[in-house]
A protein has these predicted regions:
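Glycan-recognition and catalytic cores of secretory/periplasmic carbohydrate-active enzymes
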Residues: 2-430
């Protein structure tokens, strides 16, 4: 259909979208090899990096897609350099590390605490690395974090965003499904999926379901338009604020709904749909049709933009992709197309795409965030691809949209025996 075509899907523009390489693993391998060579030359110097937002998932995904062992070797190399960050009394990692010398610490603005999302968003990658190398140390480090968090897990499943790496206890801080909290909850569900939903990973699902009850307790509805939104919590008070970052939640809820019984599954899926409607309207209620960074909700006024920049974030289109695949409702494709057209109109420039300093005026900034290529465009690509392309039955996406192959139970013989590498199955049009 005409609405799904664009000049950015042909010619030289296709090379800017990593989704282009999903069906071309050899070109992916060549592109990523150049990146790896350049990046590791930089990392060999005194580089201070976050243990969270790195490329281990991208390297493992490239290995799964291409079968080229260079990516597995480099994933192991960089992870070995990161491991000193986990050498804390509690096992909760520091969030910054110098890769050349292995010295780790937390940023000053957290008062020495570790960030929940940073500490709880390596499990997929580290488990996958142990599966593919046969070395259990990576999985052990990641799962020790979850064991520590289980000790302090509250009855509502909602953890504050700051955790003390020495005592392993939660510090008084905000509870949110937005910045610094989000992907911890996402990974509880996805590790359960990665583990083939077996008894061995049942505790991840149980923790996730507990947290979803907590999410329900944070959910309110606006007037007059009945938009559902997820509050933040500070102490005993709820704040009527929702980050666009929290718009990953509808997709997460939809992905996890089928694990419940029929009645609860319907409730969770309906909430996913309602939250997706809200997130779509984050976009539709501004003059540029692009969402602000966060929104505030006031009685009788529905929603209002808080921080008014847009930096090309992927969370809403991510959820639309999940909901389209899991419901078959093409409304989610229509909504995704509207968002893509708004990016084309407001953010497209000759050399790429840029964010907006203000979604009300349309004033542009001068930066294309890397996640626009890695996530936003990839999820849009998948939103308009058959569900067999990177099928949910065979793959699980990490929080940076890198697909990791799910190792079948018959091949997952336990850590210590490397799993065999599969040939990639190409998705076929329906």
């Amino acid at each position: 259909m005409a609405r799904r075509s664009s000049s950015s899907s042909s010619g030289t523009w296709r090379y800017l979208n990593p989704a282009y390489y999903l069906k071309r693993p050899k070109r992916l391998a060549l592109l990523f090899f150049v990146f790896v060579a350049a990046t590791f030359a930089f990392w060999d110097r005194q580089s201070l990096v976050s243990e969270y937002e790195l490329v281990v998932g991208g390297l493992l995904s490239s290995y799964d897609l291409s079968g080229d062992k260079v990516f597995l070797d480099k994933a192991k190399d960089i992870t070995d350099r990161l491991l000193p960050a986990w050498d804390t009394t509690s096992g909760i990692p520091y969030n910054r590390i110098n890769l050349a010398h292995g010295r780790a610490h937390n940023p000053g603005w957290t008062n020495g605490d570790s960030i929940l999302a940073d500490s709880g968003t390596e499990q997929l990658e580290f488990i996958a690395l142990s599966q593919r190398t046969g070395d259990p140390k990576y999985q052990q480090k990641a799962e020790n974090v979850i064991k520590q968090l289980q000790k302090i897990y509250p009855s509502d499943g909602l953890l504050p965003i700051y955790i003390n790496p020495h005592s392993g206890t939660a510090s008084y801080s905000t509870i949110t499904f937005g910045a610094m909290g989000d992907s911890f909850y996402e990974y509880l569900l996805k590790v359960w999926i990665q583990g083939n939903k077996t008894e061995h990973v049942k505790h991840y699902r149980q923790m996730w379901e507990t947290s979803m009850e907590g999410l329900l307790s944070l959910t309110k509805k606006t007037t007059p338009s009945n938009y559902y939104y997820i509050c933040e919590k500070n102490g005993g008070s709820l704040s009527d604020k929702m980050d666009e970052l929290a718009c990953f939640a509808p997709g997460m809820l939809a992905l996890g709904a089928s694990g419940y019984g029929p009645e609860k599954s319907e409730q969770i899926m309906n909430l996913a749909k309602e939250l997706a409607r809200t997130c779509y309207n984050f976009y539709q209620t501004t003059p540029t049709k692009l969402a602000g960074e966060n929104y505030f909700f006031h009685t009788g006024q529905d929603m209002g933009v808080g921080t008014s920049w847009n930096i090309l974030r992927p969370e809403t289109v991510e959820s639309l992709m999940y909901l389209w695949r899991l419901t078959g409702n093409k409304t989610y494709q229509d909504w995704g197309w509207d968002i893509f057209q708004a990016f084309e109109k407001n953010s497209r420039i000759e050399s790429g795409y840029v964010g907006l300093r203000d979604v009300n005026t349309g004033e542009k900034d001068n930066m294309m965030q890397s996640f626009f290529l890695a996530e936003t465009l990839k999820y849009l690509y998948l939103l308009f691809s058959p569900p067999s392309v990177i099928s949910f039955d065979e793959w699980v996406f990490n929080t940076e949209a890198h697909p990791l192959r799910i190792v079948p139970v018959s091949d997952n013989k336990g850590i210590g025996t490397p799993v065999r590498q599969f040939g990639r199955k190409q998705g076929k049009p329906e």
